[in-house]
């Protein structure tokens, strides 16, 4: 009887060990698997049924007087490639666009306006960027995806409404040096004040500043799906 109990115990222990060791690769694969990305417009529509604020909207439908300079629709960017075909439309989640509208309203009282360089960015574009610059300080690792892919991040600056000129921020867009960092302080007071104005008004309205890029801000809630949908599909549904 004792032998039977011992044998059962040994078999049970063996099964436990085998199960544990065979589970390790599965957990490892899950940890290192590619992120889930929505590529079909129909699946995107399903994803926002439970939350209408997830809707992707053309930014000017929410903030009509905002300015665009969509760099990735030109060759004037770090890739030196025209990534987007359309330079007149860009998109964000509805909740994020509304928050940006509040920022714009506050700045307009100072005769200032936001200028948008980039907003929604398809996941496949992030993959191309990563091929050129594998540095997470400046380009999102596709294994994680980015706020741009989720429709909740925006690259922007401030301009004077009267002149149309950008406020001096010390560097241009896509400057991958320490000078572009939020914590870089070896700059004239005018530049520091301009950066502080942008950061303050964005954070006041629910955005978080990226430490390595003074122009990059993302929404405080990242619980949004990664998207790899051509912007022209959103464009067809502009209300």
For each feature predicted by the language model, list its residue ranges.
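Bacterial Sec-dependent N-terminal signal peptides
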Residues: 1-33
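Aromatic-lined carbohydrate-binding/catalytic grooves of carbohydrate-active enzymes
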Residues: 126
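Segments that shape or occlude catalytic/ligand-binding pockets
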Residues: 122
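Extracytoplasmic cell-surface/polysaccharide-interacting catalytic and binding patches
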Residues: 28-117, 132, 136-212, 218-239
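Intrinsically disordered, low-complexity sequence elements enriched in Ser/Thr/Gly/Pro
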Residues: 2-6, 69, 216
């Amino acid at each position: 009887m004792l032998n039977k109990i011992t044998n059962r115990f040994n078999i049970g222990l063996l099964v436990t060990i085998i199960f544990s060791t065979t589970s390790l690769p599965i957990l490892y694969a899950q940890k290192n698997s590619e992120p889930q990305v929505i590529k079909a417009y129909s699946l995107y529509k399903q994803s926002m049924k439970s939350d209408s604020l997830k809707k992707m909207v053309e930014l000017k439908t929410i903030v009509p007087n905002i300015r665009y300079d969509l760099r990735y629709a030109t060759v004037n960017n770090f890739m030196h490639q025209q990534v987007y075909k359309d330079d007149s439309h860009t998109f964000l989640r509805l909740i994020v666009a509304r928050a940006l509208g509040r920022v714009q309203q506050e700045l307009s009282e100072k005769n200032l306006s936001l200028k948008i360089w980039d907003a929604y960015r398809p996941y496949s574009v992030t993959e191309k960027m990563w091929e050129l610059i594998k540095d997470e300080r400046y380009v999102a690792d596709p294994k994680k995806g980015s706020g741009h892919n989720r429709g909740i991040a925006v690259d922007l600056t401030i301009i004077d409404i009267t002149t149309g000129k950008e406020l001096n921020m010390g560097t241009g867009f896509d400057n991958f040096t320490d000078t572009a960092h939020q914590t870089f302080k070896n700059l004239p007071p005018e530049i520091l004040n301009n950066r502080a104005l942008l950061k303050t008004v964005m954070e006041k309205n629910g955005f978080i500043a990226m430490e390595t890029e003074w122009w990059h801000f993302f929404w405080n809630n990242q619980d949004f799906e990664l998207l790899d949908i051509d912007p022209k599909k959103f464009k067809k549904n502009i209300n």
